[in-house]
């Protein structure tokens, strides 16, 4: 499982012109799931994301987590994270999990984040989405479960 994590001042996701998820201060997560991923991967990433110290403290050091600063999560499924561009001119998405495997794990990750006390907004799984954000920093990290 891969997550591109972006610290954001604000973000929203729309589907067919309708806002389906929006946050102020917090994290935008682009979540990719592959064939061998399990609920344990989802739990591991939820813990890592909730406690990763990437927000600045009063001294200007990255010393606080999204939980510490009262931030929220905007979680978006993103199968294209498993696109392989090494051959040809069109990405190969064979490493991305099928929706019937990926969607329950996506929901599990979001549920674990909520259980850790975070407010979670989501996109719509499998939909074409427009994502807008104001990247804070910018701080962008790739977090993987394996």
Swiss-Prot record:
EC number from the UniProt entry: 3.1.1.96
State the Gene3D superfamilies in the record.
D-tyrosyl-tRNA(Tyr) deacylase
List the catalytic activities from the record: glycyl-tRNA(Ala) + H2O = tRNA(Ala) + glycine + H(+); a D-aminoacyl-tRNA + H2O = a tRNA + a D-alpha-amino acid + H(+)
Motif Gly-cisPro motif, important for rejection of L-amino acids — list its residue ranges.
Answer: 137-138
Keyword match Phosphoprotein: no
| Keywords of this entry | Cytoplasm, Hydrolase, RNA-binding, tRNA-binding
Protein's UniProt keywords contain tRNA-binding: yes
How is the quaternary structure described?
A: Homodimer.
**Which gene holds the coding sequence for this protein?**
dtd
What InterPro entries has UniProt attached to this entry? Answer: Daa-tRNA_deacyls_DTD (IPR003732), DTD-like_sf (IPR023509)
Name of the protein in its database record: D-aminoacyl-tRNA deacylase
| Primary localization | cytoplasm
